[in-house]
Each structure stands twice: as C-alpha cells, then as structure tokens.
C-alpha cells in the first residue's frame, strides 16, 4: 500500500526510462545480426531482462554495462536451450521470441508468469504454423506454455486483423529466415519500430500504405549487420508526467528525449486536443527514430475528447492515464475500439471503470471501451491496481492532484516498465 497526497506544484526536468518496445527489439535484433551491437541507454526492467535472459539461454553472449549493453550477434544460429524459456510478465518477449524460435531447427518451450499464461498467443502461433513451424500448447496453442520446433519456413501473406505490432514483428523476424517473401497486411499501421530498426541493421523492408491496409514485406535470406542503437525515452512513461504537469496547480516540467514516433504519439495529440499546454523543443532523429524535449505546463480546463478505433494503436498503453485526464475534463469523453485492453496485464477497461467509479466519477463501460463524465468532485480512496503497472502509475497521478488521500495497492508492480517511478515523482513535485 502506498499513500498519495496532494502536491503544491511541479518543477524541474526528467529523462524518464528508455522506451520498452525499442529496447526489446534492439536486444533481439542484436542477437539475430552478425557482429556486435551496442545498445545505448536501454531500459533495464522486468520485461526487458526477460528478453535478455532468453537470449542468453539460447547462447547469446551479452555484456551489461551501466548505460549500455553489448550483444555478440549469432546470425540466427542459436543453440537448443537446456531449460524452459521464461518470458515472465512480458507479452512482447513471448510473442516476438516465438517468431525467432520458429526459425530454429531445435525444440524449445516458452512460458510466462500467471498473468502472461492467460494472454492470447494464437494470433502469433497460427501464422507461424502456416509458415511451417510446429507449435503446440495449452488450448491448442493459444495459451503459454507453448512448445516450438522450428526451421524450414516459407514466406506467407498474412492479414494482421488486430494491427498487432508484436505479431507483425514475429512474422518479419521469422520471414528473414523463410523461403521467399513474407508479407503482413494491417487494417491500420501498428507501431513500426521493427521495420525502422531492421533498416538500421541493413535489411531491405518494403512498406506500402494501401487502401486495403498497410503492407509490410520482407525477403528471406537477408543478413542483419550489428550496429549501434540509441534508445530514446519512453513516451508511455513520459505520459504520466505530462498528465501530472497538466493537472498540477502550478509550475512546469521538461521531459527530455521523448520518442515521438508517429505510431506512438497519440496520447500527446489527444492532450493537445484537450487544450493541454505542451511545447516540443530540440527535435532530432537518432537510430531512425524521432525524439524531442517536451515542456508541459498546467491548464485550468480540459476539453472532453473521443478516441476512435483507428487511433487506439497509437495510444494503447496510455489509455489508463488518458482516462485520468478525461475524469477532470469538462464534459463526456469516450474511448471505442479498445477491446485489446481486456487482454493486457489486467483487464484494463474493467480496472479503469472500477477505480474511477470508486472515486465518485460517473463512467459507462462498453465491451471495447468506456465513456467518462468529467467532474471537479473526485474523491479519495483505495485503488485496486490488479497488479498492473499502468493502472498503478495512472491513479498515482490522480492521487497527486486531488484533495483527499488516495492509496495505491501493490505499488511495487511499477517495476515491470518503470522501476524508478516513485523516486522520479519526488524529483519533480513540491508538497
């Protein structure tokens, strides 16, 4: 349990931890490449360590420094693991590594913690089977643990109906070791870090935005070359502080080196649409990814907003903190087309609705989202996080700006993506 009290102001600057999506991919592509890859400023958290441990278990040599990780690439020639591979709480690790393991002519078993064992895997297992991998598991391969025997893959064309970046990434990385061309079609573009990074590692990736959706193609047999990858600050982690500065009584916060990839900046677009005071400075591009410093100041009134299904992929991880902003807005805000939230570390729709109602906010729940009636009368109370890091951090921000005391249960769950969250809050607020 952690007690949260109201702040007087926000101040100073912060470089939140590096982007989780980019860190996972840098570690994995570094292992798949030939030669060495230097990953600068990686996020070291529960999820990314799960990826590193699995790579080590299939005999990747890794040297971990304070601000960098050096990976000796194996050019897709891994060794059969002695033991079960554990993705812990990380869906990204489980799904992308399924694609990598499918290229290997050996047997492996992939599992996860209790939460991950309940998350759907068929979305990645089915296309990998179609490519030729032999995969079995609980509920016909839909739930971890799954057993994989890979090798001899052939390219396929696959319609990725959920626009899942994890599925797309798994298929592209499997496609590099498949015969012919592998093509992924999405109704709308999901986060594109894998495509950008594959190009950084020297692969040719063809992207075609078309009427029937966004198409990504990769030709089998290409070799990745080790390189240097710089990891910018995670926009999902920065979002909590941008929201805090927006709702604070006074002050300003500068958030440094925040990733502004157009497939990931939906939260900031919505914050601007709500009337947020945010400016972007020092814009630049490193390792094929755009970033900038954000300066955020408080505003008195927030306008309500609607999030449509096609906007959801650009802000899926920020919906809990966006919901907190919506609770303070002047009117009714709505999120639709976000059913995917029910299959995250917790059922996030249920978690958002339950906790906001507990604090006196009127909320309507839909199968694929919710509607929030903004109010100035938000009460205190005990937040049930469902051990979900994003729920804990979102409601911590709420607790810092309401009069009554808010208590967060299982505050330690933030270590999944942001181990220093509680310390960082103290750096930028005055009570």
From Swiss-Prot:
CDD domains: EPSP_synthase. The active site is at 317 (proton acceptor). InterPro entries: Enolpyruvate_Tfrase_dom, Enolpyruvate_Tfrase_sf, EPSP_synthase, EPSP_synthase_CS, RNA3'P_cycl/enolpyr_Trfase_a/b. 3-phosphoshikimate binds at residues 20-21, 25, 164, 166, 317, 344. Pathway: Metabolic intermediate biosynthesis; chorismate biosynthesis; chorismate from D-erythrose 4-phosphate and phosphoenolpyruvate: step 6/7. Pfam families: EPSP_synthase. One of its GO terms (molecular function) is 3-phosphoshikimate 1-carboxyvinyltransferase activity. Its EC number is 2.5.1.19. Keywords: Amino-acid biosynthesis, Aromatic amino acid biosynthesis, Cytoplasm, Transferase. It catalyses: 3-phosphoshikimate + phosphoenolpyruvate = 5-O-(1-carboxyvinyl)-3-phosphoshikimate + phosphate. The keyword Cell membrane does not apply. It comes from the Bacteria. It is an enzyme of class 2 (transferase). GO terms for biological process: amino acid biosynthetic process; aromatic amino acid family biosynthetic process; chorismate biosynthetic process. It is found in: Cytoplasm. One of its GO terms (cellular component) is cytoplasm. Phosphoenolpyruvate binds at residues 20, 91, 119, 166, 348, 390. Belongs to the EPSP synthase family. HAMAP family: EPSP_synth (MF_00210). Monomer. Catalyzes the transfer of the enolpyruvyl moiety of phosphoenolpyruvate (PEP) to the 5-hydroxyl of shikimate-3-phosphate (S3P) to produce enolpyruvyl shikimate-3-phosphate and inorganic phosphate. This is 3-phosphoshikimate 1-carboxyvinyltransferase. It comes from Aquifex aeolicus (strain VF5).
């Amino acid at each position: 349990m952690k007690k949260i009290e109201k702040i007087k102001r926000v101040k100073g600057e912060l470089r939140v931890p590096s982007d989780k999506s980019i860190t996972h991919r840098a570690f994995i592509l570094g292992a798949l490449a030939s030669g060495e890859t230097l990953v600068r400023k990686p996020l070291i958290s529960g999820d990314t360590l799960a990826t590193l441990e699995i790579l080590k278990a299939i005999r990747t040599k890794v040297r971990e420094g304070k601000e960098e990780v050096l990976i000796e690439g194996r050019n897709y020639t891994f060794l059969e693991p002695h033991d079960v591979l554990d993705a812990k709480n990380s869906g990204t690790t489980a799904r992308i590594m399924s694609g990598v393991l499918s290229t290997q002519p050996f047997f492996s078993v992939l599992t996860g913690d209790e939460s991950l064992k309940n998350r759907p895997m068929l979305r990645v297992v089915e296309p990998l089977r179609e490519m030729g991998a032999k995969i079995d598991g609980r509920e016909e391969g839909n739930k971890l643990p799954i057993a994989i025997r890979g090798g001899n893959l052939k390219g396929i064309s696959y319609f990725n109906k959920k626009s899942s970046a994890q599925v797309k990434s798994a298929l592209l990385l499997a496609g590099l070791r498949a015969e012919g061309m592998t093509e992924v079609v999405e109704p709308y573009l999901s986060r594109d870090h894998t495509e950008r990074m594959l190009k950084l590692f020297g692969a040719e990736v063809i992207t075609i935005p078309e009427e029937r959706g966004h198409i990504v193609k990769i030709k089998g047999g290409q070799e990745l070359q080790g390189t240097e990858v710089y990891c910018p600050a995670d926009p999902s982690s920065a979002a909590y502080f941008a929201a805090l500065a927006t709702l604070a009584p006074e002050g300003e916060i500068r958030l440094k080196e925040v990733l502004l990839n157009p497939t990931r900046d939906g939260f900031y677009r919505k914050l601007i649409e709500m009337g947020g005071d945010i400016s972007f400075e020092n814009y630049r591009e490193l390792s094929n990814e755009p970033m900038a410093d954000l300066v955020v100041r408080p505003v008195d009134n927030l306008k309500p907003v609607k999030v449509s299904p096609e906007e959801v992929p650009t802000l899926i991880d920020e919906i809990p903190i966006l919901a907190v902003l919506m609770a303070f807005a002047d009117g009714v805000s709505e999120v639709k087309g976000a059913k995917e939230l029910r299959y995250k570390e917790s059922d996030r729709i249920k978690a958002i609705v339950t906790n906001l109602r507990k604090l006196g906010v009127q909320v309507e729940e839909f199968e694929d989202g919710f509607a929030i009636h903004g109010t100035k009368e938000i009460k205190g109370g005990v937040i049930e996080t469902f051990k979900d890091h994003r729920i804990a951090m979102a409601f911590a921000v709420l607790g810092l700006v309401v009069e009554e005391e808010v208590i967060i249960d299982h505050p330690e769950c933030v270590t999944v993506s942001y181990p220093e969250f509680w310390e960082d809050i103290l750096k930028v607020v005055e009570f």
